[in-house]
């Protein structure tokens, strides 16, 4: 069954395809539009690549946590990520809120190249993201830490 799907973000428009044997969502992401996924997990396609999120746990404060893999590359990422505020940038990158495998805290924002499997920590948790002409403005609305990401080549990629 194919239907238009609006998630918790009002401007987000995704295509949701349901398979009767598997409740995992298939989502075609759009650049800059946050995606929030539920406990069923999701396979997200973006510019010729794909990331698959599989449910792992839900912490006491809510918001599901997922393990992630890049099935076209045969790579399982070595951290878990929250299924909220997943933002795809440029043609290659996913910005996600991540945690160490088996935990839910501390949260760190991570930039992931879904075409190569490389990733770079942004060093802190940024829950407010704004794309501007001069770069990506990232803010932690709880402790007011902020940064502007201008050049991804300045990050330490793993």
Summary of predicted features, one role per range:
Residues 7, 50-53, 68-71, 128-130, ...:
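Generic preference for hydrophobic/aromatic residues in regular secondary structure cores
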Residues 2-36, 56-80, 103-124, 142-158:
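Surface-exposed loop/turn elements that mediate protein-protein interactions on large endomembrane-trafficking
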Residues 43-68, 91-92:
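Amphipathic, interaction-prone secondary-structure segments
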Residues 55, 97-98:
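Recurrent small/Gly-Pro-centered beta-turn motifs in extracellular repeat architectures
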Residues 23, 29-48, 78-92, 97, ...:
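Repeated scaffold domains used in trafficking and secretory/extracellular systems
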């Amino acid at each position: 069954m194919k239907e238009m799907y609006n998630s918790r973000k009002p401007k987000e428009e995704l295509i949701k395809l349901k398979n009767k044997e598997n409740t995992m969502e298939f989502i075609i992401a759009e650049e800059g539009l946050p995606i929030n996924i539920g406990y069923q997990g999701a396979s997200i396609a973006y510019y010729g690549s794909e990331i698959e999120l599989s449910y792992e746990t839900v912490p006491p404060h809510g918001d599901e946590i997922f393990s992630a893999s890049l099935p076209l590359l045969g790579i399982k990422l070595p951290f878990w990520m929250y299924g909220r505020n997943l933002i795809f940038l440029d043609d290659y990158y996913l910005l996600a809120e991540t945690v160490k495998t088996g935990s839910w805290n501390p949260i760190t924002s991570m930039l992931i190249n879904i075409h190569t499997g490389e990733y770079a920590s942004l060093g802190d948790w940024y829950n407010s993201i704004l794309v501007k002409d001069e770069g990506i403005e990232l803010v932690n609305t709880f402790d007011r830490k902020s940064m502007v990401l201008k050049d991804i080549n300045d990050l330490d990629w793993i």
